[in-house]
Amino acid sequence: MPTWWGRKSCKNKDDNHRGIISTDRDIKSSAVVVDPPLTPTRGGTPRCSREFAGASSAFSGFDSDSTEKKGHPLPRPLLSPVSIHHQDHVSGSTSGSTSVSSVSSSGSADDQSQLVASRGRGDVKFNVAAAPRSPERVSPKAATITTRPTSPRHQRLSGVVSLESSTGRNDDGRSSSECHPLPRPPTSPTSPSAVHGSRIGGGYETSPSGFSTWKKGKFLGSGTFGQVYLGFNSEKGKMCAIKEVKVISDDQTSKECLKQLNQEINLLNQLCHPNIVQYYGSELSEETLSVYLEYVSGGSIHKLLKDYGSFTEPVIQNYTRQILAGLAYLHGRNTVHRDIKGANILVDPNGEIKLADFGMAKHVTAFSTMLSFKGSPYWMAPEVVMSQNGYTHAVDIWSLGCTILEMATSKPPWSQFEGVAAIFKIGNSKDTPEIPDHLSNDAKNFIRLCLQRNPTVRPTASQLLEHPFLRNTTRVASTSLPKDFPPRSYDGNFSLQPTREPYPGRLSHDNYAKQPLSRTIKSPSRENVRAITSLPVSPCSSPLRQLGPAYKSCFLSPPHPSYAFPGQDSGYNLAEFAASPFRMKKDAMMEPSSFRTQTPNSPLRSRLV
């Protein structure tokens, strides 16, 4: 047995007793950081011990012929290829400094095995198997010094405090006891998650197991780009319109459709207006790109004109006002639709207008103009056809004027010419489309303002909303009475002058059978919430009890004070009705039988019969 066997055993026990902290500090100091020479003030530290003398001073471990102070160098750390790669980038030509921890010929195998066992219990940073790196960026400190594990830590190591920080936390502020999440596997181009997804907010989102909540229904028609189907949401029960485009990689037409549809998605995702169709989401599959939009069951203006003929002027006024409201919103966001026409304007059952088909729409900045030739030829503005100096929001105003002519005549302007001839007529001639004679002067003036060839003198959408043609119009879905208009007797036409009756709801007894109730009483405006509430009705005015002429001279009961109309006195004046010039007659159904025995003690009601 060698003479130093006992002393070495004591060293090994002492080394095991020091545990994790001393070995970890030596590994870090020997592998990466070169400690400065020992000073007398550090004499009491573990690095002054004889076991660590070889690794305490700079490059002292290279001297294999050193005497009694020569320590046993630690073995080379079991670095993964990734960590070695990072070390090579940092150390460069100084990688020889790591030979301090290399196996020396002066150390025995037992010492090495014990040191490896001690280091395996205490070190976490270097004893890591090679794992795929996540695509996240690595901080310079993490890349140059250590490679953090990407797999969860063992429970026995969860209580070990990091020695790099005095607070026991990592560089990112998290505690060292937290588990590190596993890296996500790289997504292949053919994986289902890369193909099946839904797009909401500008990016395609993966739906769970490729299952879509929207179910495709019947075919509705073909649009500019693809087909349109009816859709149903299986979770919310909401209807939608599904616009589909075939995804064909080697087809130029399919690529153009996808490009335009993606442009429409990006634009509609940023818009929110009652006169613009609402965007719900989109989904990309292996064969199609589906866009889910608000379903407007009434169809387009073009379809209504085809089915029912040209519109009357009140309908044109109502639709034009709503179209301008949507255009004013778009132009306020520096967006040009570029394809305003009847086929791209939808109408719901209540007469509400929705602008649709934004595949041609374009966002315009203050330093750019549009030069591309896009839109339908019959509705194109002259500056679009000429494409000389570019064009701006005024092109939508010209198209609006053409759409008004379309609604008034059931055909687009310049329809007597073919497509190329119409384009030539718009671009080179000084003529304007013919305006029908049956329209009012305000309507004609409105159309002439929209169809001015000089785009700089065309009014804006906000200015056109103040035109007399639209200023005094109201929605078709609502009554023509203002919100604060109280109920009055109806004399055949609507008048804003109040009647002279003390109680507006009171009717004369001579014309009740010939004259209906006021429209405001029978069907109040939906905008007046208080008028929707049912009013109390006296039995004499009930429609179930009109058996004789006695009940044709009655009046409505006064409203309850809480249901009074604006500007109407809710008081109930009995003296007013006592002065009525007529008498209420008897009712055989309400009065008791005249054959009842009459006695002095009979009730007063029986004695009066």
Swiss-Prot record:
Name recorded for this polypeptide: Mitogen-activated protein kinase kinase kinase 3
Keywords in alphabetical order: ATP-binding, Kinase, Nucleotide-binding, Transferase
Residue ranges with Low complexity bias: 40-64, 90-108
Subunit structure: Interacts with PBL27.
Biological processes per GO annotation: pattern recognition receptor signaling pathway; regulation of defense response to bacterium; regulation of defense response to fungus
Tissue-level expression: Expressed in flower buds, roots, leaves, seedlings, stems and immature siliques. Absent of mature pollen.
Catalyzed reactions per annotation: L-seryl-[protein] + ATP = O-phospho-L-seryl-[protein] + ADP + H(+); L-threonyl-[protein] + ATP = O-phospho-L-threonyl-[protein] + ADP + H(+)
Phylogenetic classification of the source organism: Eukaryota, Viridiplantae, Streptophyta, Embryophyta, Tracheophyta
Origin species: Arabidopsis thaliana
Domain of life: Eukaryota
Binding site residues for ATP: 220-228, 243
Family statement: Belongs to the protein kinase superfamily. STE Ser/Thr protein kinase family. MAP kinase kinase kinase subfamily.
Compositional bias (Basic and acidic residues): 11-28
A Pfam family annotated for this UniProt entry: Pkinase
Enzyme Commission identifier(s): 2.7.11.25
Compositionally biased residues, Polar residues: 594-609
Region feature Disordered, mapped onto this chain: 1-202, 487-511, 590-609
Active site (UniProt): 339
Gene Ontology MF term list: ATP binding; MAP kinase kinase kinase activity; protein serine kinase activity
